[in-house]
Amino acid sequence: MQPCLVKIRRIRSGSDLPLPRYMTPHAAGMDLCADVDADLVLEPGERALVPTGIAIALPDGFEAQIRPRSGLALKHGIALVNSPGTIDPDYRGEIGVIIVNHGADAFVVRRGERIAQMVFAPFVRAELLDVDELDETARGDGGFGHTGR
């Protein structure tokens, strides 16, 4: 498989944070670190936009998906509000991660903490065709649990 070449820029020069990286040889996502100057305390139910200190330039036809880290979700109830978040190939601003604390205790985001993961994926752009009717299928309009719980 041909790698997707992504240009990356540190927002603040001289940053001590590592660039996003794969943590295992077969990982699908690169971990993103929190670029906060001071500890950020999230009380239960609170959400915050956490900066990552990086901006990227994706090749046309690719997106970056920002996804939660399962360990933070399981151990602390930390999730992403818009999961997955999408970074479009024409966006050049800093990547921010909107996290929410669904846990019972306060959660502290510290500088350099791995808060999310970034997965690169190709996408297609659809053309919409306005029609009066759609073709029939066996499923029809069944949804929202129609096959069971």
Swiss-Prot record:
It catalyses: dUTP + H2O = dUMP + diphosphate + H(+). Pathway: Pyrimidine metabolism; dUMP biosynthesis; dUMP from dCTP (dUTP route): step 2/2. It comes from the Bacteria. One of its GO terms (biological process) is dUTP catabolic process. The keyword Cytoplasm does not apply. The keyword Hydrolase applies. One of its GO terms (molecular function) is magnesium ion binding. InterPro entries: dUTPase, dUTPase-like, dUTPase-like_sf, dUTPase_trimeric. Its cofactor is Mg(2+). Substrate binds at residues 69-71, 82, 86-88. Keywords: Hydrolase, Magnesium, Metal-binding, Nucleotide metabolism. Its EC number is 3.6.1.23. PANTHER family: DEOXYURIDINE 5'-TRIPHOSPHATE NUCLEOTIDOHYDROLASE. Belongs to the dUTPase family. This is Deoxyuridine 5'-triphosphate nucleotidohydrolase. It comes from Geobacter sulfurreducens (strain ATCC 51573 / DSM 12127 / PCA). The lineage of its organism: Bacteria, Pseudomonadati, Thermodesulfobacteriota, Desulfuromonadia, Geobacterales.
